[in-house]
Each structure stands twice: as C-alpha cells, then as structure tokens.
Swiss-Prot record:
Designated name of the protein: Peptide chain release factor 1
SUPFAM superfamilies hit by this protein: Release factor
Record's keyword annotation contains Cytoplasm: yes
A Gene Ontology cellular-component term: cytoplasm
Modified positions (N5-methylglutamine) in chain numbering: 238
PTM characteristics: Methylated by PrmC. Methylation increases the termination efficiency of RF1.
Recorded superkingdom: Bacteria
GO MF annotation list: translation release factor activity, codon specific
PANTHER family the record matches: LD18447P
Entry coiled-coil feature ranges: none
Compartments it resides in: Cytoplasm
Keywords carried by this UniProt record: Cytoplasm, Methylation, Protein biosynthesis
Length: 362
C-alpha cells in the first residue's frame, strides 16, 4: 500500500477518535445541529476506521508469523506458520481492495432522497403499460429497502400503466442506489392485445435526480414562475376532480415545468412543487447546464428511442440485459418483483472500477 494512503487512513482514525470524544461533550450534546452533523461524520468514518485497524492487525499477524517461521525448526510448526502467513496475506489483499474502494471520491448526493420519473417512449399503449410495470418494480424495491415512495404526479395510459409518473423516494442512500437507473429501458414481449402472438418492442425513459438541499445559491424571482392549477387525475377518492388542487409551476427563463397532485391541499402541492422546481434548477446549475433544466433529463435518458437503450427486458426469454456492463440475468420474473440488488451492485462495482482507473491515471 502506498505510504500516502497509509497517512490519510491514519489521519482518518485520528479524526474518528476526535469525533467520538466530541460526541460526549455536553456542549455538543446540547447543540442539536452540531450533534447531528458530528453523528453523520462519525458514522461515515466508523467502517473505514474499523477496516483500517483490522488491516494493520493482519499485517502484524503476518510479520509475527514470518518471524516465528524463521526461528522454527520443527516441520509441523513451519507448516502451521506458513499457513498463517498465507491466510494473513489473503486477508490483507481483500482488505486493501476494500479500503481502496472506500477511499474513492464520494458523490455528496448519494445519501439524499431522489425524484424518480418514468415516461412512456416509443411503443404507444404498450410503452405506457410497461411504465406501470417499471413503477411497480421500483415500488417493490423501495418497500424491500424500507424506503418511502410518494407519487407526486401521474398521467395514466388509456389501456393501463402511465404515460408519465413522477415520484419522490426517501430513505437511506436512495440516490446512490438508483442513480444508474437513468436511461432508456426497452421491453420485448407479446402484448395482451396481440392476436398473432408477435413480439413487440417498446421503450420507456427513467430519470433519477437527487433532491438537493435548498440554499442561497438558487434565487428564484417569483415573477419568473408561472403558477397554474388543475384537477387531480389520480387516486384520491371522492375529492378527485372536484377541486383544482393539483399544481403546475413553470420557470419561464429555463422552461422547467413541474407538477404535483399528491395532496388534496393546493397549498401542500404548491410547496412540494416548489421544492421539486428548485431541486431541478439547482442540479442544472451544479452541472453547468444553464440552457434549461430539461437538458439534464435528455442527458440522463436520451430521447426515448429504442436504439438508445441501457437495458432490455425480454419476456419470452425471461431475460434482462444491461447493455452498459454486458450483464445478462435469466430471472426476469424476480427482477420485475423488485429483485434489483444484483443489477445495482454490478453497476456500482463498474462505476467504482472506473473511478479507480481515473484516480490511478491522474
């Protein structure tokens, strides 16, 4: 391991011990904001500190075993010491790989909630139906993770599914898990309306954007925001379509449009829509895409054309293929039931490998 990395890890251990002590300080305990901030830092440092201490311990074990091997004369003792050396060496290699991953640059948005948007692309009614299938897939995954998924806006398809559905997902590390889902998702299957049994191909777009904290870097002039109301079209019992409680906000300079019809209260919908609007505009600013907030969605998902797919769901073959990492799994039924960890873990490993390559080449 490089000496510079050892130094950084030792510094992190020192900081971990410092933060641990601060969390017992009465002045910190009485300051809710400071205590919360240090608790998050303590949690972030705990795993890497523990792993680094175990790594150092394994190095010590290896060195002790090597010293004993040199002194040993008994063949059985030599064999036992060599086994200990080999075991310690394997452990060190595994832990060094894990430490390298943990030291990679972190996306500050990985732990925040996310807006998940699904839109029907090419394929007409079948694309809308598949949008509904994707929504239920993510909904079940969110439930399995203990996350909360809220539907903010939904435009239902004529024969089921959704032409568009926008949700907010909150919980632990939501954006970090879902951010690789952005792109065109292609489906190949025989529609229920197909009498000849022919396989049809259609597509949906998925966009995942972090819910960034509102700060002073985004200042919206109220005169630049057009406020419209309309009647909710989704679930809501007897109150649906009786009042104009749904809200649409348009940021005129960028053309950014957001809608929210989750609540029966127009006031609550407006507050949520404003949060969505600021999040979108702030993310555009962070990525230096000042032309319009819609640019970020095009970068994330493409145009919705089947040729721009990131993933294909082939129902006749029970197959899912992620084209970015050449991963094919023959368990489509369980995937559509929300079994996404194998896919998401593989995408994360590929991302980490790319980061390590870029850091190594820097």
């Amino acid at each position: 391991m490089k000496e510079s990395l050892r130094l950084r890890l030792d510094q992190m251990v020192d900081r971990y011990e410092e933060v641990t002590a601060l969390l017992s300080d009465p002045s910190v305990i009485n300051d809710n904001n400071k205590f919360r901030e240090l608790s998050v830092e303590h949690s972030d440092l705990m795993d890497i500190t523990t792993l680094w201490q175990n790594y150092v311990g394994a190095e010590t074990d290896q060195a002790d075993a090597e010293a004993m091997l040199k002194e040993a004369s008994d063949p059985d003792m030599k064999e036992m010491m060599q086994e200990e050396i080999d075991s310690a060496r394997d452990t060190i290699v595994e832990m060094e790989e894990a430490l390298n991953v943990m030291m990679l640059p972190k996306d500050p948005n990985d732990k925040v909630p996310a807006f998940l948007e699904i839109r029907a692309g090419t394929g007409g009614d079948e694309a809308a139906i598949f949008s509904g299938d994707l929504f239920r897939m993510y909904q079940k995954y969110a439930q399995a993770q203990g996350w909360t998924l809220e539907v903010l806006s939904a435009n239902e398809g004529e024969h089921g599914g959704y032409k568009e559905i926008i949700t907010r997902v909150s919980g632990n590390s939501v954006y970090g898990r879902l951010k690789f889902e952005s792109g065109v998702h292609r489906v190949q299957r025989v529609p229920d309306t197909e009498s000849q049994g022919r396989v049809h191909t259609s597509a949906c777009t998925v966009a995942v954007m972090p819910e960034v904290e509102i700060d002073d870097t985004v200042n919206l002039n109220p005169a630049d925001i057009r406020f419209d109301t309309f009647r909710s079209s989704g679930a809501g019992g007897q109150h649906v379509n009786t009042t104009d409680s749904a809200v649409r906000l348009t940021h005129i300079p960028t053309g950014t449009v957001v809608e929210c019809q989750q609540e029966r209260s127009q006031h609550k919908n407006r507050a949520q829509a404003m949060k969505m609007l600021i999040s979108k505009i702030q993310q555009v600013k962070v990525q230096a895409q000042v032309d319009a907030a819609d640019t970020i969605r095009r970068d994330l998902v493409g145009s919705g054309d089947r040729s721009e797919r990131i993933r294909t769901y082939n129902f006749p073959q029970g197959r899912m293929t992620d084209h970015r990492i050449n991963l094919t799994l023959y368990k489509l039924d369980s995937i559509m039931e929300g079994d996404l960890d194998e896919i998401l873990d593989a995408l994360l490993r590929e991302h980490q490998a790319d980061l390590m390559a870029s850091v190594g080449g820097a």
